């Protein structure tokens, strides 16, 4: 009798953040494509997965958002250890953290720790706790959120034009953010704060999200890893079975040359 060995998951660990389900900006097409094709032992949802800020203001949830949730739960059912670390946009889940709940096999945690195959100890946090605007002046963060959403509208029209010209998806809003002097300074402060916290607590590195800026580099001797987002860049951080860490640019890896059409929103009552 031949007994087949279980298929080894593609990755040892996968980290995704800032999907912002519940907004029109969420790239559910790219995200579902990724979740449906990868497999992993550990899946970390590093905050701002569901955008409670936007859902409180106006309800938007189409079938593509349901599909993303279904795919995450399918990973949990198939044995993937799924850990959800809420951020500031899904802070409603933080009230449940003291209960240590599991929802559909998804563990809710205020933060997490992950040890790679090579022995690196990584702190996993969303990162809003280290953003001075969110921490000290949350009303400014909300105002900034409005300006950010406006940039995403511009980004979508820009990419529609690129689609008609036969060019691949490219994030204009992310490109602008990397070149605005004050934004660059804010990113540097954020990175230094996260790296400092990881060092203070004895970790070798930190995995975060929050600023929608995928990055993998050393900051003052600490490995700083930002998983990016699924609104602008559509990136994920993965750990291979040999412990190697890699940032995946999903649209670029798959040669997406157009934006998939979006289904019409299903009217919902708030």
Descriptions of predicted regions:
Residues 1-5:
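A short, compositionally biased domain-edge/stem linker segment
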Residues 6-12, 21-117:
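Core catalytic region of metal-dependent phosphoesterases/phosphodiesterases
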Residues 13-15, 43-45, 123, 207:
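Residue-level marker for buried hydrophobic side chains located in beta-strands
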Residues 18, 47-48, 87, 126, ...:
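Active-site glycine-centered loops adjacent to acidic/histidine catalytic or metal-binding residues
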Residues 19-20, 50, 128, 251:
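Anionic group-transfer/hydrolysis microenvironments
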Residues 100-110, 123, 128, 132-142, ...:
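Conserved beta-sheet core of the metallophosphoesterase superfamily
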Residues 125-190:
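Active-site-proximal loop/helix segment associated with metal-binding centers of metalloenzymes
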Residues 250-270:
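C-terminal regulatory/interaction regions
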């Amino acid at each position: 009798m031949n007994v087949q060995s279980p298929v080894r998951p593609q990755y040892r660990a996968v980290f995704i953040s800032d999907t912002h389900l519940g907004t029109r900006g969420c790239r559910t097409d790219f995200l579902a494509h990724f979740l449906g094709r990868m497999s992993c032992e550990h899946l970390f949802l590093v905050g701002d997965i569901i955008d409670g800020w936007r859902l409180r203001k106006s309800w938007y949830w189409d079938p593509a958002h349901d599909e993303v949730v279904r795919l995450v739960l399918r990973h949990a059912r198939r044995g993937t250890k799924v850990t959800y670390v809420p951020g500031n946009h899904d802070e409603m889940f933080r009230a449940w953290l003291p209960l240590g709940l599991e929802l559909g096999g998804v563990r809710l945690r205020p933060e997490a720790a992950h040890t790679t195959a090579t022995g690196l100890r990584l702190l996993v946090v969303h990162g809003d706790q280290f953003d001075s605007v969110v921490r000290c002046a949350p009303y400014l963060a909300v105002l900034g959120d409005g300006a950010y959403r406006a940039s995403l509208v511009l980004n979508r029209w820009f990419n529609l034009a690129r689609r008609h010209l036969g060019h691949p998806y490219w994030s204009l809003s992310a490109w602008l953010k990397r070149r605005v002097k004050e934004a660059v300074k804010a990113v540097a402060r954020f990175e230094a704060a996260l790296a400092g916290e990881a060092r203070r607590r004895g970790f070798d590195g930190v995995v975060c999200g929050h600023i929608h800026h995928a990055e993998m580099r050393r900051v003052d001797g600490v490995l700083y890893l930002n998983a990016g987002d699924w609104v602008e860049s559509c990136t994920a951080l993965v750990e291979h079975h040999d412990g190697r860490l890699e940032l995946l640019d999903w649209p670029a890896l798959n040669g997406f040359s157009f934006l998939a059409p979006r289904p019409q929103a299903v009217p919902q009552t708030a």
